[in-house]
């Protein structure tokens, strides 16, 4: 998220959300994701008010590029340890509940990479 200032609070919430998702803790990622979106909206409000950045801002009620990219990354949810799937497999008697980890890492990596590329392409198309 290069267009978010280095010291902006949104970066902290985005990082917390991504780390929680990375470890398969979706329930812990949700509050950080909500706060990140709120902070991104505040950032967009600041851009709208700025005489220099005002042209960059999007109309109120429309998600900006950072919001869309964050949602894509959040939804694709790159995971190292799919805790919920392991728990379900254990609950239903799997003899090797962690066998899914490799496939889960591959699937979430591919979905995250494709999502980020999609967001990047859409940003470029929007600028044309």
Each predicted region: which residue ranges?
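Signal for well-folded cores of large energy- and translation-related assemblies
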Residues: 41, 93, 122-126
């Amino acid at each position: 998220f290069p267009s978010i200032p280095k010291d902006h609070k949104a970066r902290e919430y985005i990082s917390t959300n991504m780390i929680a998702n990375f470890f398969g803790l979706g329930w812990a990622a949700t509050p950080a994701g909500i706060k990140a979106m709120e902070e991104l909206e505040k950032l967009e409000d600041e851009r709208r008010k700025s005489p220099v950045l005002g042209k960059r801002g999007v109309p109120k009620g429309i998600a900006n590029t950072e919001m869309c990219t964050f949602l894509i990354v959040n939804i694709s949810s790159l995971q190292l340890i799919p805790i919920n799937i392991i728990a379900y497999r254990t609950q239903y008697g799997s003899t090797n509940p962690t066998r899914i980890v490799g496939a889960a890492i591959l699937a979430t990596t591919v979905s995250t990479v494709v999502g980020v590329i999609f967001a990047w392409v859409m940003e470029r198309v929007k600028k044309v």
